[in-house]
């Protein structure tokens, strides 16, 4: 009988989006590869996020999925080519960590010897899997829930490693392109997809002078996409000499490197926050309508700021109250400053929840 290290399994992981969800699923990849180093693993992912995984040493390939083309007849030929490719691969395991109709259909079309999904399938995806893994409890963190598929496959869950591998060439490129050296960096992430998860930009701007006055050697890098440029401009005006507005200016891998080289991130509940947790970069996370015990920065939950209001967590994209977003608006820059200082202090161990 072959030892686990000699077993050659061909595996497809389906987790196309979002950034935070993909990052939280990476320990599944790492542990499979550690336990079965001869395995051949592919990851099915939205094209916008593919650069995060392309070149990953644990992957045999990245399968790009154009979500916007899913229902467009003019792209059906391309979709069928993807389907034929899936059928030809003869996967041993198909692991769907997305559990939506699209991913469920592709899990079924892949025709693996064993297909696995999670116990919260939406859009009727439940029928596409041979085995469904239940969430251990209502408050089980997403990372631990994803990892719970591994015992079904005979893969032990014991780990302590960085989820995102170092990219020395890219890191050197970032240092050449931006004035990284000669300063210590705090990264700020003001944007989110949900307006209800966004700490007010004025509060971020008010935080900058507090941190600047107490930390003379630090500068501030403001992260975000093109849509976050207005937020970056407001925050950068708080201290133009020490703020570097990078909103809309970085590729996804470059953003990862900026978070890697920084000593602290202050962030809303959004994808880059999970990148920081994956890299081990200290985080102060600002939560309103969502549940940090399920989706907070993994292994850094003591450093989440969330108010104890009757409506929290509501899990709504829009606030139903007359004073909208009070759950985040009532978090003061002074409170975030105090939490940040504890994270920056060499002997800090206390957090705030």
What label would you give each PLM region?
Residues 1-353:
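Catalytic machinery of carbohydrate-active enzymes
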